[in-house]
Amino acid sequence: YLNGARNRLGSSAAVGGTGFLFSQRILDESHGWRFYLLTEDIEFSIHHILRGERIAICEDAVLYDEQPTDFRQSVRQRLRWAKGYIQVFRRYGADLLKGTARGSWSCFDMSMSILPAFILTALGLLANLTLTALSLMQGDGVWFALRSLLECMGSILATLLVLGGITVASEWRRIHAPAWKKIAFTLTFPLFMLTYLPISMAALFMKVEWKPIHHSVNLTSLPSPAVKN
């Protein structure tokens, strides 16, 4: 969805670690592979966007991504991603902002992608919590503060639910799972995404190192000709 929209707007896409292709020229001009932050795919993308390269997508490409086996592994993976975004922004943030000031939409887009969105969300929640605490101490405006906090949380959850619903609806036939699971997972998707908040906050202070993520896939659950052959 993100890269498709970027491609249609003439902006640069971003590569994903699941799979991407680049020419020997790109590797030669970079003097070999020199991207070793925790999210090296995003680092690779931003490095070349800053050099004026445009990353495109192949609409017909099909990539199979193995997911973490359990919630604990998912937390470990997302903690690495969150820390990686911080690392990338620390290294390339100033150049991205300069590119944005020069009118580069791709630089602006990448800035908004790696600037931890949780910071804005956390600031909004923190402001509402602070207002609630002050109201409780002063004894006035408590319900106003609580309503503001609930509205903030409600808008976040509603937005995530809509995004998840659109994705599942448009990819319904490609998601090989019972209908009830698709619906249940769509409804619980906002709650899953909220777990990014503590994960991302932890990434600000924790020392995060790369650790293997356990993946597994049951081929019999993927009824496709490619698997059968």
What are these regions (language model features)?
Residues 44-45, 74:
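Short, hydrophobic alpha-helical packing/hinge segments within bilobed ligand-binding/sensory domains
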Residues 94-110, 134-229:
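Juxtamembrane C-terminal module of membrane proteins
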Residues 109-127:
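Transmembrane alpha-helical segments and their cytosolic interface motifs
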Residues 69, 75-113:
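Active-site-adjacent helix/loop segment of glycosyltransferases
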Residues 45-64:
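Catalytic donor-sugar/metal-binding loop of nucleotide-sugar-dependent glycosyltransferases
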Residues 1-38, 79, 86, 90:
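Long helical/loop segments within the catalytic core of UDP-sugar-dependent glycosyltransferases
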